[in-house]
């Protein structure tokens, strides 16, 4: 099984692709850049976009994981929805299954959340709604990592010191959540 991950530092922090590969026994490849939005993965004029388009055109994948910039589903929802739609088209042309990696609200009471200017519950709700809507409209699998973080936020520290990026436990929770969704689908299709 081959998995491609398109996104940013929420993927490469703590080497989440290696964690996902270990759990799924799949080959996992990432195409990431810190701060990247999904729109950039579609732009052949950027290094990241040219590579993403090449990977989708020239290599065979079973699953392609899409992860938007941390607050992008809220601050640029229209752009996010359009990017998911376009990427899902390219992913399906490849014969792969799109998976949305739904990310989390910034750390409760953390400096990143304070800078963003909304409360934790509101950010969680808006992120959850945006990813759920994108998954429904595009018929994708949804790895709801944001909800997994939300459920554990009172009992576990899942964040790096910046209040945005995951610590190792957070990346592991993300890998487990993504793996669970992919393995369930793969088993149903006889791939796992």
Can you describe what each PLM-predicted range is?
Residues 12-13, 73-74, 107-110, 151-152:
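Short catalytic/ligand-binding loop motif for oxyanion handling, primarily in non-cytosolic enzymes
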Residues 116-192:
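Catalytic His-Asp segment of secreted/periplasmic serine-dependent ester chemistry enzymes
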Residues 79-93, 122, 126-133:
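Alpha-helical scaffolding segments of alpha/beta enzyme cores, especially the outer helices
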Residues 41, 111-112, 153-155:
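Short, well-ordered secondary-structure micro-motifs
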Residues 27-29, 97, 139-141:
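Conserved beta-strand segments of alpha/beta enzyme cores
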Residues 21-24, 91, 135:
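A generic structural signal for well-ordered alpha-helical segments
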Residues 92-125, 145-147:
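Active-site segments of SGNH/GDSL-like serine hydrolases
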Residues 2-6, 10-85:
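Conserved SGNH/GDSL esterase-like catalytic core that processes O-acyl groups on lipids
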């Amino acid at each position: 099984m081959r998995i491609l991950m398109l996104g940013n530092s929420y993927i490469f922090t703590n080497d989440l692709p290696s964690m996902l590969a270990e759990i799924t026994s799949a080959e996992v490849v990432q195409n990431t850049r810190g701060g990247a939005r999904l729109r950039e993965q579609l732009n052949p004029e950027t290094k990241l976009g040219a590579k993403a388009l090449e990977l989708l055109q020239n290599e065979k994948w079973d699953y392609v994981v899409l992860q938007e910039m941390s607050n992008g589903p809220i601050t640029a929802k229209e752009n996010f929805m359009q990017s998911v739609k376009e990427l899902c088209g390219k992913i399906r042309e490849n014969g792969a299954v799109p998976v949305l990696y739904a990310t989390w609200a910034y750390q409760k009471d953390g400096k990143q959340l304070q800078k963003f200017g909304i409360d934790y519950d509101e950010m969680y709700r808006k992120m959850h709604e945006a990813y759920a809507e994108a998954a429904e409209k595009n018929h994708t699998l949804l790895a709801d990592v944001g909800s997994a973080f939300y459920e554990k936020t009172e009992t576990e520290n899942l964040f790096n010191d910046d209040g945005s990026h995951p610590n190792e436990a957070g990346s592991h929770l993300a890998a487990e959540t993504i793996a669970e969704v992919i393995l369930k689908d793969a088993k149903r299709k006889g791939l796992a």
